[in-house]
């Protein structure tokens, strides 16, 4: 239809300025500090995260499947308990935030609100839904894309990893080797 044709034309432009007029706000209710570092690399966004030291909850963390499969879940949980005990001890000694910040473990979960325009989301989804992206940010980005596709299918059905959007993988020798499966996945409903 005409709307889809116009959107495809916009996505083929190098500048994509028209896409900057539409903004979308997403809530990530439990993103690890590790994934947050990937999100903050996208400079064209308004990002709201709580004060990490005041809101650190050492009982809310991401448990990677690789840790579980390695049989290291109890040791992993213990690391958070040790970090929490050290943070309490330093706090009781009136340690400054500069010292306490070193005890923030990358797996801690925080709620994050991000607002990006459709142009920045184009870049975000191309990079972060790729099989080569860090696993957690890839899962969060794929879920965000699923939500946006449900709300705005005409535009966001065209978004996804680069191989889906252009038909070619930009990773060269580092390609995941699953281009056909990835393209099929993103051609569907996710």
Show the residue positions of the predicted features.
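Family-specific signature for flavin-dependent thymidylate synthase
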Residues: 1-190
């Amino acid at each position: 239809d005409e709307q889809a044709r116009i959107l495809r034309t916009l996505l083929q432009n190098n500048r994509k300025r028209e896409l900057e007029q539409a903004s979308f706000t997403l809530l990530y209710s439990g993103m690890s500090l590790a994934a947050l570092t990937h999100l903050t690399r996208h400079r064209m966004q308004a990002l709201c995260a709580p004060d990490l030291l005041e809101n650190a909850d050492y009982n809310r963390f991401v448990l990677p499947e690789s840790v579980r499969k390695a049989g290291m879940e109890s040791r992993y949980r213990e690391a958070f308990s040790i970090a929490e005990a050290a943070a309490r001890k330093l706090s009781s000694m009136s340690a400054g935030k500069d010292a306490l910040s070193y005890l923030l473990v990358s797996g801690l979960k925080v709620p994050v609100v991000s607002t990006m325009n459709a142009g920045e989301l184009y870049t975000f989804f191309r990079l972060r839904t790729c099989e080569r992206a860090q696993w957690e940010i890839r899962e969060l980005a794929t879920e965000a894309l699923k939500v946006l596709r449900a709300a705005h299918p005409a535009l966001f059905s065209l978004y996804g990893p680069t191989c889906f959007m252009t038909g070619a993988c930009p990773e060269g020798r580092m390609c995941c080797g699953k281009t056909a499966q990835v393209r099929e996945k993103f051609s569907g409903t996710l």
